[in-house]
């Protein structure tokens, strides 16, 4: 069978809509995906058996060396919501505040918050059949509830819209139509429970990624500068290229951080990253970013202009390397080398101070 026939046969076997409701893009490589998934399915089956044994009984999930190892190897879809809720602390928060989520929805809202959320509903996952108005049930109402409740729960953040801006504009950090709405949307797809999605969003925005979504976005800006320093330490040739062209890192990686790789990397890869993010915290984002850059260092160094650099950073988030999520996750724990929270905390302190001095 020649490649064209193999591709056509794979297209006939692989559903056009993935298990999460996303339509596969026109240029989707069905043959490569089918080949990858045939081996990944074996891994998923083995992991499912191990997780079922671990979760047997009513003891719950507690952070441990064993759980950390299991999480890094992937949480089966059927257990993902339960494990995320446990390791992130969201379950404990929800248990401590029975009825709180529903009281938020029953309270008074502000017209500006309501308008901001409604503006983004139709443009949240337009390629996902579950978020379309024609879907039954349509997840837009669930998404609205989660975002409204969170905006009322955390008024310092409210609802962070990431509006479309031209690269390099004064609001360049708020690039693309992606942000808190897309993160909440992913949570809803996995938990299928709006209250759990609310508490997981609270874990991310309130604790795991503090100040990422505040009006000043100081935490987000700080971590982008931290990545720049880590690249300077671990990949000096790439840092020199950026410095030589005067490229701001926010131009290249702001969406990686603020979207947590949603709409950037393949869905299953994002979920594997989030498995570790909920369990190990924000250093996982740095591991993913450094791995993407290091793996494609030679390709990036071929760039000869700012537009060329930007294009290469878009290209490194596509292809087999990021689609083959199991191998990719193994890479993020080996490629960047040692990366302690002590180092990240130290860099955050100095980078934050520098940003505050500038402003």
Curated annotation (Swiss-Prot):
InterPro entries, per the entry: Rab-GAP-TBC_dom, Rab-GAP_TBC_sf, Rab_GAP_TBC_domain
Pfam families: RabGAP-TBC
UniProt entry keywords in alphabetical sequence: GTPase activation
UniProt keyword Ribonucleoprotein present: no
Keyword tRNA processing assigned: no
Positions of the Rab-GAP TBC domain: 74-281
Tissue expression pattern: Highly expressed in testes, expression greatly increased at postnatal day 20 and remained high up to day 90. Moderately expressed in kidney and liver, weakly expressed in intestine, lung, ovaries and stomach. Expression of Growth hormone increased the expression in testis but decreased expression in liver and kidney.
Domain of life: Eukaryota
Function summary: May act as a GTPase-activating protein for Rab family protein(s).
Protein name, per record: Growth hormone-regulated TBC protein 1
